[in-house]
Amino acid sequence: SLLDRLSVLENNGKLWYNIDGYSITSEEFSYPFNEEGLKKVFSKHKISNKDIKTKNSNIHTDNFFVTKNSKIIGDIQQVNNYYFVKNKNNNISVIWFIKARNTDKNMEEELVNMILENKIPKENYSPITPYVINFAGREIKLGGSCYWTALNTVQCPYNGEMNWSIHKDIQDAQNAIDNQLMITKQRKGSEVVAEKMVDVIFEGTPTKAKQVTLKLKGITAALAGMSGGKSLTIYYVAEKVRDRNVSCVMSFWNDDNINPKTKLPPLLEEIMELK
């Protein structure tokens, strides 16, 4: 079900959601759901008069739906689906779905209704500081030195970084890591110097990962040179774990705390071993 794939984080009055490789936010505004209020909220979200606004009858309250594409990088687009909805205070809530491609209207509508009707249990919420994370149904203790850079993206300075999502099927998980790799390859300031498939054991399951080595170049390299981080190793995995379809991207710098035996830093050792 949707709740098995969903994680939520509350931060600065905004709610962040992760599911199926989407990045989603919901925010309540103090403007009433009327023409004047909507005008203000549309302009905050750069929605112009030209943008088509439709009513979605599957949402259980008055609403306007807007979809727009925007550029992520190079020729890679992301889809932005906005639901401007009337909440229980008769004000406007905005639920904004972002995904690189393959959006899922049924899931979006179901989640919007759950958000409006307060049907998401506290178990789906992540702690604001990730001392412990729920990684695809298993609790992992990280201690106090890690932080979220986005929901389901955890950074542990000198110990590695990873992001993950849980998907409705394995193809969607594969698409998610393919998209991340395409975005990485188009980033300015770095270049892919090696790329290969490697055998790994991911959360106890033997599988293949794509291993990519990235070198910084030009001014980026000069800036990073001060901390010694010159090359980044990234692993891309899509696999079924505890009955969940997981996409996961893990990375570390060459000057991180790498265990010479496992060739991995502590965060990555928690979930993967190289064969």
Show which residues each predicted segment covers:
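Surface-exposed amphipathic alpha-helical segments
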Residues: 97-140, 144-146, 242-275
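Signature of long, low-cysteine stretches enriched in small and polar/charged residues
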Residues: 7-89, 188-244
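Flexible, glycine-rich surface segments
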Residues: 132-208
